[in-house]
Amino acid sequence: NEYSNLVESMGAKGVNAGTYYDWTFYHSSFPAYQINKWLEISSQRFLHPVFRSFQSELENVYEEYNRSQDDQGRAQNQFVMEKAFEGHPYSRSIIGLPEHLKNPRLSKLIEFYEQWYVPENMVLVLVGNIKAQQISGRINAAFGRLAAKPSPERKVYQNLEIKGRKQHSAKVGFYPQ
């Protein structure tokens, strides 16, 4: 994608992103002397997001979903999450369901982005040959341009009541008939 190409051209390595139940992360390792350029490029991806590669990224996610169907560890983990967190969002697959991946709407993605990708929900972690006192002004200059918005209201879920012991079994893997 364009962001990866840009930061890799300045020496970044390990450019990646990932999502879990409660968070998304973006990671890259880059030379300390490129900090100003990295701050500008990274802040721009939130100031002026480009969803041009939406379809190709979606295809990557769908392919990841398909690969996960053959992964016994993932299948076991998903089974445990479904049973342990029944009725809670943690019971759902992080990557989504095929019906969500087959017919997504860009408008829904943008709506989600605008609701949740707000400064109050973001944390920037920098590690390496940098001094916080020297860099904090540049961080504020780059990311301080993000418009402050109230954090979205979060749904409150009831604590799961676990009473007694439950036992579930599942076959995972290849079992010939």
Predicted regions: what they are:
Residues 21, 59-60:
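Short, conserved phosphate-binding/catalytic loop or strand-edge motifs used
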Residues 58, 106-142:
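Non-catalytic, conformational "gating/processing" segments within enzyme and secreted inhibitor domains
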Residues 2-32, 67-121, 145-177:
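Non-catalytic beta-strand/loop surface segments
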